[in-house]
UniProtKB/Swiss-Prot annotation:
Changing W379R: In strain: El Tayeb RSA 342. Homodimer. This is Isocitrate dehydrogenase [NADP]. It comes from the Bacteria. The gene is icd.
Length: 427
């Protein structure tokens, strides 16, 4: 261990700890943020090299403007993906000290990561979520005036998705067709469990979908608490319980149980919907549920009826990206992955390697994820300025190519120029 401003820090092999700054800590489930927090960041693969510097510039400008030098983020680079293999060795896509640094410093932000080709880690993003138990994927979706949209009233979309991150078929428990494991499991299901419904057992890949009461409860608890803290009027449990009764159906039932037992929700008109009074504002919060396929229709037809969404992993993936398309695409869709102690904020899009190093793509997703991070730290003033800056740049039609090609009279600018336009509207 070494000492830094009175705070013990793990000694790292390749990570350079800033000479100034302090750790964020958690005390009795409350985040304690110093005025000069050290924030680890993963640049990301592909276009990460373009968007990460812009994100940091925008955040630094917003923090400086808000607090006049009294607060400042000390950025600390950590490694994952292709860059990690160059620093740590060709097969080390997710170094142990990267995970340790995120745990040590509590809050981090990352660009997009390449999924390694071949065996081993199937997805670096999934590996990070599982190894850090980041059980909430938080995806707020809102519309910025002037952003091109394929729907008539995108301004009606204002939802926050709580996607369960640790279970469901994303747990990665599956085996390919014909493998010894698949054959063994199928034989067990047929011979020991009496399963007759596998149509082509000889050529079937097989997977397992775990959904637990504990996993469901902690997600729904966070979603309901978010609705309370942010004065939202409803929490919707989205599921396919009509088909998968003991996994998705159980998710719905356990979700209602949390609302009743922990928040005092009462049946609304005899149920199944429930309602309770927000203890902070006195407003009513409705707990409801919708079948996933019907919900995907409703977000197009009646989006204003939905506010906070709690759902399982696969449904959450579909829903998050479908909603993002309504308000301008994943180029400006932010996201975070949360445990009870760690917050990892991220760009929600891919690495787009063909654009890497061209200073061309929209950095909005990562910048808005940083805005979420600032709000998570309690730095509301800086977060509001980031939103102000993005709104100003878009309203002035100074945008990257993905928006410019769809906007009349727009001025197409580079990634870095878009960052400067945002900062102009911050300052």
């Amino acid at each position: 261990m070494t000492e830094l401003t009175g705070v013990s820090i793990v000694t790292y092999q390749h990570i350079k700890v800033p000479s100034q700054g302090e750790k964020i800590t958690v005390n009795k489930a409350v985040l304690e943020v110093p005025d000069r927090p050290i924030i680890p960041f993963i640049e990301g693969d592909g276009i990460g090299i373009d968007i990460a510097p812009v994100m940091k510039n925008v955040v630094d400008a917003a923090v400086e403007k808000s607090y006049a030098g009294k607060r400042k983020i000390e950025w600390m680079e950590i490694y994952a993906g292709e860059k990690a293999t160059k620093v740590y060795g060709k097969d080390n896509w997710l170094p142990d000290e990267t995970l340790e640094a995120i745990k040590e410093y509590q809050v981090a932000i990352k660009g997009p990561l390449t999924t390694p080709v071949g065996g081993g880690i199937r997805s670096l993003n999934v590996a990070l979520r599982q190894q850090l138990d980041l059980y909430v994927c938080l995806r707020p979706v809102r519309y910025f005036t002037g952003v091109p949209s394929p729907v008539k009233t995108p301004e009606k979309v204002n939802m926050v998705i709580f996607r369960e991150n640790s279970e469901d078929i994303y747990a990665g428990i599956e085996w390919p067709a014909g493998s010894p494991e698949a054959v063994k499991l199928i034989n067990f299901l047929q011979n020991e469990m009496g399963v007759k419904k596998i149509r082509f057992p000889e050529t079937a890949g097989i997977g397992i979908k775990p959904v637990s009461k504990e996993g469901t409860s902690r997600l729904v608890r966070r979603a309901i608490q978010y609705a309370i803290d942010n004065d939202r009027d409803s929490v919707t449990l989205v599921h396919k319980g009509n088909i998968m009764k003991f996994t998705e159906g159980a998710f719905k039932d356990w979700g209602y149980e949390v609302a009743v037992k922990e928040f005092g929700a009462k049946p609304l008109d005899g149920g199944p919907w429930h309602v309770f009074e927000n203890p902070k504002t006195g407003q009513k919060i409705t707990i409801k549920d919708v079948i996933a396929d019907a919900f995907l229709q409703q977000i197009l037809l009646r989006p204003a009826e939905y506010s906070v969404i709690a759902t399982l992993n696969l449904n959450g993936d579909y829903i998050s990206d479908a909603l993002a398309a309504e308000v301008g695409g994943i180029g400006i869709a932010p996201g975070a992955n949360l445990s009870d102690t760690v917050g990892l904020f991220e760009a929600t899009h891919g690495t787009a390697p063909k654009y890497a190093g061209q200073d061309k793509v929209n950095p909005g997703s990562l910048i808005l994820s940083a805005e979420m991070m600032l709000r998570y730290l309690g730095w509301k003033e800086a977060a509001d300025l980031v939103v102000q800056g993005i709104e100003g740049a878009i309203e002035s039609k100074t945008v990257t190519y993905d928006f410019a090609r769809l906007m009349t009279g727009a001025k197409e600018v580079s990634t870095s120029q878009f960052g400067k336009a945002i900062i102009k509207h911050i300052l």
